[in-house]
Amino acid sequence: MLLALSQWIAEDIRAFNVFSYITLRTMLAALTALSISFLIGPAMIRSLTARKVGQSVRNDGPQSHLIKAGTPTMGGTLILTAVIVTTLLWADLSNRYIWVVSLTTLGFGAIGWVDDYRKVIQRNSKGLSASSKFFWQSIIALLVAVYLAMTADLPQHTEMIVPFFKEVAIPLGTFLFIVLTYLVIVGTSNAVNLTDGLDGLAIMPTVMISGALAIFAYVAGHAVFAKYLGIPHIPNAGELAVFCGALTGAGLAFLWFNTYPAEVFMGDVGALALGAALGVITVIVRQEIVLVIMGGVFVMEALSVMIQVASYKLFGQRVFRMAPLHHHYELKGWKENQVVVRFWIITLILVLIGLSTLKLR
């Protein structure tokens, strides 16, 4: 929107051509989303509190969590509002990737919103059934996967890139590309949701990974940089850096309210949407393996749940004191802030390793 306006003004005032630079618009998007979140955040939290949109707490969890009961949830609507409004303002709205990512984010956010609404507004403790959630997640993810497969311009746009090796890629073909895309989007969405169990635990890794994906998107969309770094050139993917900038800014602002002791939780509306956004951006810029590296905390959290369930069903024993993994460490005696900050540190290290794959080939 503002890009189109600046291009129109630039016909008379050439200085406005500066807004055509993706790097500038990415920074402005981060600042805009940050500002929007800070402006409307307090009012939204007050509204959620007044409506008694409070979080329920598991009785079988750490006893320290009982004080969290009643804390406003569905704060993910704040993040989504800031991200989408900012994207509409600063991104090139003729770019199809912007719409793919935005609509995917909103779609998964809608699933999470319905789940949260049923749990906290209608007082239905089960919320949206697991099968219903999985069904709608699958529908959206498959639609996105098929669309990306059908619109892939070159064979390398559907290859799996192997990091740390120069020009090593695994041809997937249409079917395997669709399967991989589906797994990445649905898997990342649910992994972020599982991680969102402590104050600030999920949002900061999301911010760090989003910032890294902004760099991957920018270089993938730049023919010269992509060739130099030995990664696939994805025309027009650079515009996704603007979306990532908005997500980074909105996420940092949300952390202001979500840090311990949290004033608001993001709820499924935020966690499912943010995970899906990271997943679909990763697929577009062809960095699925790198996402597994950078999102190691999300991977560990999801695996801990799968291992716990499988072990109990098969052998009647639990591997962890409690799943997801962050609760295991709490029950071992770690304070909540210790778990959160240590997981942040792990994510920072993994993100730096992920970024190093751009050069270490």
Swiss-Prot record:
Cofactor(s), by name: Mg(2+)
EC numbers, comma separated: 2.7.8.13
One GO term describing the cellular component: plasma membrane
Keyword terms: Cell cycle, Cell division, Cell inner membrane, Cell membrane, Cell shape, Cell wall biogenesis/degradation, Magnesium, Membrane, Metal-binding, Peptidoglycan synthesis, Transferase, Transmembrane, Transmembrane helix
Matching InterPro entries: Glycosyl_transferase_4, PNAcMuramoyl-5peptid_Trfase, PNAcMuramoyl-5peptid_Trfase_CS
Keyword Cell inner membrane attached: yes
Membrane topology: Multi-pass membrane protein
Pathway: Cell wall biogenesis; peptidoglycan biosynthesis
One GO BP: cell division
Catalytic activity of the protein: UDP-N-acetyl-alpha-D-muramoyl-L-alanyl-gamma-D-glutamyl-meso-2,6-diaminopimeloyl-D-alanyl-D-alanine + di-trans,octa-cis-undecaprenyl phosphate = di-trans,octa-cis-undecaprenyl diphospho-N-acetyl-alpha-D-muramoyl-L-alanyl-D-glutamyl-meso-2,6-diaminopimeloyl-D-alanyl-D-alanine + UMP
Presence of the UniProt keyword Transferase in the record: yes
Broadest EC class assigned to this enzyme: transferase
Ranges that cross the membrane: 28-48, 73-93, 97-117, 134-154, 168-188, 200-220, 237-257, 264-284, 289-309, 338-358
GO terms for MF: metal ion binding; phospho-N-acetylmuramoyl-pentapeptide-transferase activity; UDP-N-acetylmuramoyl-L-alanyl-D-glutamyl-meso-2,6-diaminopimelyl-D-alanyl-D-alanine:undecaprenyl-phosphate transferase activity
UniProt cross-references to PROSITE patterns, sorted A to Z: MRAY_2
Location of the protein in the cell: Cell inner membrane
Protein name, per record: Phospho-N-acetylmuramoyl-pentapeptide-transferase
Organism: Nitrosomonas europaea (strain ATCC 19718 / CIP 103999 / KCTC 2705 / NBRC 14298)
Lineage of source species: Bacteria, Pseudomonadati, Pseudomonadota, Betaproteobacteria, Nitrosomonadales
